[in-house]
Each structure stands twice: as C-alpha cells, then as structure tokens.
Amino acid sequence: MTDGDHQIPNKKKDAFKNFVDDAGIAKYDKAAEGDKYSKYVLTDFGRKICELGGYDSTAWALILCNLAYTPAYNWFINNLQLGVCYSPDSIKDMLGYVMENDIKGLGRRNILSALKIVLSQTPLGKERIFAEFNAEEKKEKITLKSMERCTWENPVPEVILFSLYKFAENCGDYYQ
C-alpha cells in the first residue's frame, strides 16, 4: 500500500491503513519490504473486492459485513434504529455516552466525518445499502444534514451467505 509519490499525509495513510485492516481487505505482513504502509498486502478477501471493483455495490456490502464487527460500525448498527432520521448533533450526543473521555468532542466529530464520507462516496449510502443520508455538497466539502438507517432493498444472496458466515465466525466459530 503506497501513495506512489509520498504526497498523502501520514495521518490520512494511518486512517486508510486502519480501514483496510478493519474491512479485511489488507493485513500487515512484517516480511514484506518497505515502510509500515507498504507492508500491508491484500488478503484473499481484498483480492475479491478488487475483482468486483471499488464502486460495486456487492463489494461494499461485503465490506460492510466485515466492518459490522468493528466497534464503530457495530455501535451504529446497534444504536441507530431503522427508519429513524438522525441529525449529526443527535448522533454526536448519543456517542457522548460511550465516549465519556472525549471532552472536546473531536473523537465524535471524526467518527461522524468518516461515516459521512463513506455514505456520500460509496454504495453504502448512494445505493441505500446501509443508510439514506441527506447532505449538501459544495466543491469538496460535504455537510451532513441527516441520516436514516435503512434496509437493503435488493440484497445479493452471496452477501447474505457471507454475513451468516461472519456471524458464525464471530460467535466462537459456530458453523453448525
């Protein structure tokens, strides 16, 4: 994993590295050559995602199956009810109960900012796989107005099977 010409700040590379790791797309390989970023190599799952393509709704639904078991996405899934419209401020307030040490609110802001980007730039929001969102876009700035968790209207059977596999895996390898 490299930005090619070293123009991306390390903070953004760290965030991306964490995302691809959480999503199961790439894993750290200490035997690989290069710096801490280029030591991340594609997993079998990551290769499948690349085959499907970065804008493919099935790819993003599969990624969501992995992300559902990370603390941030798991919180959204368990705390934002389906069909209820939430403002950014209401989500920040809800996050405040689980992020008590986030006195300045920077952590809550960062979580909401990341969610806003994922919803506005991927099929998870654009094709209503995870949520419907209302945002205002001006130049490169996106302002989230509201979001509502929704059900996926046309789920792909392979994604459902993968989600069941992930569920079994996260229940202590209960596959029967």
In which residue ranges do the predicted regions lie?
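Donor-sugar nucleotide-binding helix/loop cap in glycosyltransferases
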Residues: M1-Q176
